[in-house]
UniProtKB/Swiss-Prot annotation:
Residues 1-17 form a propeptide. It comes from the Eukaryota. Coiled coil: none annotated. GO terms for cellular component: chloroplast thylakoid membrane; photosystem II reaction center. The lineage of its organism: Eukaryota, Discoba, Euglenozoa, Euglenida, Spirocuta. It is found in: Plastid, Chloroplast thylakoid membrane. PSII is composed of 1 copy each of membrane proteins PsbA, PsbB, PsbC, PsbD, PsbE, PsbF, PsbH, PsbI, PsbJ, PsbK, PsbL, PsbM, PsbT, PsbY, PsbZ, Psb30/Ycf12, at least 3 peripheral proteins of the oxygen-evolving complex and a large number of cofactors. It forms dimeric complexes. It comes from Euglena stellata. Belongs to the PsbK family. This is Photosystem II reaction center protein K. One of its GO terms (biological process) is photosynthesis.
C-alpha cells in the first residue's frame, strides 16, 4: 500500500517536471533559469568588492 502511494507521488512529480510539447524548444533555457538568482547573489559580492565593502 505504501509503495503504491509512493509510485503515485513519483508519477505526479514526473508529469509536473515535463514541459508541454509546444514549449520543447525552450527546454534548455528552462534548465538554466534556476541558476539566475544565484548569479545575482554572486554579482552583489563582486559589486561590493569593487566599492571596497563600504
Amino acid at each position: 500500500m505504501f509503495q503504491i502511494s509512493l509510485d503515485m507521488i513519483s508519477n505526479k512529480i514526473n508529469l509536473l517536471g515535463l514541459l508541454p510539447e509546444a514549449y520543447a524548444p525552450f527546454d534548455h533555457i528552462v534548465d538554466v533559469l534556476p541558476i539566475i538568482p544565484i548569479l545575482f547573489f554572486l554579482l552583489a559580492f563582486v559589486w561590493q568588492a569593487s566599492v571596497k565593502f563600504r
